[in-house]
């Protein structure tokens, strides 16, 4: 059940060890922690968290982001939910979808996908319903471009699921009434600790909505499944085989629809793909490092998120352990990348980050520093500049702009 709760005040922040950040977060705040809403300059931004006793989170948080000056209001708890580690918005309606990354939803060995309605004025979320993800540990969710289906990837279960969306935003079950809405991956790869079996780590619809692309870390494949959002079905189609032990994790299409990128968790690389939209096929054409040359001790390092700048000129990826954002310039004709460097996030464990729709700002989630770091993006070079305004959020692991 969802409900609004008091904002992150000094007493709760003291439990997180974040009181020193409160002053920079509460800029022009209103009751409930939201900035005055100017539709031309501010928008809602949601934060998914890992939940538990402090300093962990309690669910999904919401704030307002001002794209004019790059300020973020004090976050408010928008909905209580267990481990809402990834979020996705409906493309046209006020609905948000979240995974509950657990292995015991409704007394079964699966996680769940949750549908929530958005109050446009406050950002508060009301739960509509939830459905089984069909596997344990769902860690990624997306919505097809038509807004007719939700897609989720199960890390523990090593599978992918498609759930139809009702007109009121609620989710239809996949497994009971529509077995064609579920795919179980199979196989393993060379890393015995992390690749003993399939581990779906992301799922993204193609720009035309005909395919769903799944990075499976456990089998070193980027799988392209045929998608029929109207029927709520997915089916195996093609697959790109990655370097053994690379561990593809997250994926992003370029705005030109001809190129795409994966970030590979285990070997700290980014791979560039040519994408044949008609055939639904990916071809790897370039792979390069996410960290600067000369770093020999990479113990404890792994990558996490990848995103393409709205202009298509730059690509960014996050490094955990190194705790930085890798920056790349894009060659327009080929989609290939040139490494620009890695900017420290001034926090720990950037599991996720997001670029605001204006393309002027990047927000990085420090999972283990319990805060969000704000960066200005140089529109000519793509380089990041830290604004000096970290904002406290408990155990943030996903950032989504509305």
Where would I find each of the regions flagged by the language model?
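C-terminal segment of N-terminal export signals and the immediately downstream linker at the start
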Residues: 7, 28-46
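A short beta-strand motif characteristic of beta-propeller blades
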Residues: 74-79, 127-131, 189-193, 236-241, ...
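Short glycine/acidic-enriched loop and turn motifs that connect beta-strands
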Residues: 51-54, 102-106, 157-158, 219-220, ...
